[in-house]
UniProtKB/Swiss-Prot annotation:
Belongs to the universal ribosomal protein uS2 family. Residues 243-252, 263-272 have a biased composition (Gly residues). Pfam families: Ribosomal_S2. Residues 235-278 are annotated as: Disordered. It comes from Sorangium cellulosum (strain So ce56). The keyword Chaperone does not apply. This is Small ribosomal subunit protein uS2. InterPro entries: Ribosomal_uS2 (IPR001865), Ribosomal_uS2_bac/mit/plastid (IPR005706), Ribosomal_uS2_CS (IPR018130), Ribosomal_uS2_flav_dom_sf (IPR023591). SUPFAM superfamilies: Ribosomal protein S2 (SSF52313).
């Protein structure tokens, strides 16, 4: 699928789209994190209602950051391992030419990237062996063993192929679910952009997007617009003649040379959930 950049001036997340997708439905009030209080409008039938004015304002901030990050030559790592997010994250990351993790986050994916890169090199070797006819010269038992190894590496590292170094940012579906990924990013000062539900700790996120991180329509809406930000940034880089390394979509995947984030941590900037999931 060819990525098409949004038109300049398009508002990233219209209020009507947020309502239709159920982005405003938080968790049960008894499951909330009090740090999310500034982003909560109220409660209805035991469910916290997220303040969508905050969502639109903070998403615009995140959108501008991501556009600038990619426009300067960086790449974004999309992370979403929960079942309802996996296909959406993979599809949108590929559309934007970005990297992704949709199965289990392997410890050290960022903090021990040298080991991860060894796995990526091994995956590339096995793919080459399969394509160039090497398998045909091996015993069937050996081919079966190598294929199992290749399939396992593809499952956990396939979305990182071509990634030569740290991303300029990570985009996360559910900080509570992806706590290890966020911990690694924070250790390395990699900015975190995240759909942050009412049970999450916003202090761990640089660019909070208050919203429902369980409903499929909510995840799809926000993830698609994050991908749009990346597409817009890539187009901006192309227009300015700053080259262009491709990511998971297939390309050189050189190391991101810059970290465009300036400033400290803290992206706050100043029943119905399951019904919305279909």
């Amino acid at each position: 699928m060819q990525a098409v950049a949004p038109q300049p001036g398009d508002f990233p997340l219209p209020l009507r789209s947020l309502l239709d997708a159920g982005v405003h439905f938080g968790h049960q009030t008894k499951r909330w994190n009090p740090k999310m209080r500034p982003f909560i409008y109220g409660a209805r039938n035991g469910i916290h209602i997220i303040d969508l004015d905050q969502t639109t304002r903070l998403f615009k901030r995140a959108y501008d950051f991501l556009t600038d990050a990619v426009g300067r030559g960086g790449h974004v790592l999309f992370v979403g391992t929960k079942r309802q997010a996996q296909d959406i994250v993979q599809e949108e990351a590929r559309r934007a030419g970005m990297y992704f993790v949709t199965n289990r986050w392997l410890g050290g994916t960022l903090t021990n990237f040298r080991t991860i890169k060894q796995g990526l090199d091994r995956l590339r070797t096995l793919e080459r062996m399969k394509e160039d006819g090497t398998y045909e010269q091996l015993l069937k038992k050996e081919v079966v063993r190598l294929e199992k190894e290749r399939e396992r590496l593809e499952k956990y590292l396939g979305g990182l192929k071509g990634m030569g170094g740290l991303p300029a940012a990570i985009f996360v579906i559910d900080p509570h679910q992806e706590s290890i990924a966020i911990s690694e990013a924070r250790k390395l000062n990699v900015p975190v952009v995240a759909i942050t539900d009412t049970n999450c700790d916003p202090d761990l996120v640089d660019f909070v997007i208050p919203g429902n991180d369980d409903a499929i329509r909510s995840i799809r809406l926000i993830t698609a617009r994050v991908a749009d930000a990346c597409v817009e940034g890539a187009q901006r880089r192309k227009d300015h003649g700053e080259g262009g390394q491709q990511a998971a979509g297939g390309g050189r995947g050189q190391r991101d040379e810059i970290n465009v984030y300036q400033g400290g941590r803290g992206g706050r900037g100043g029943g119905p959930r399951q019904q919305q999931a279909s």
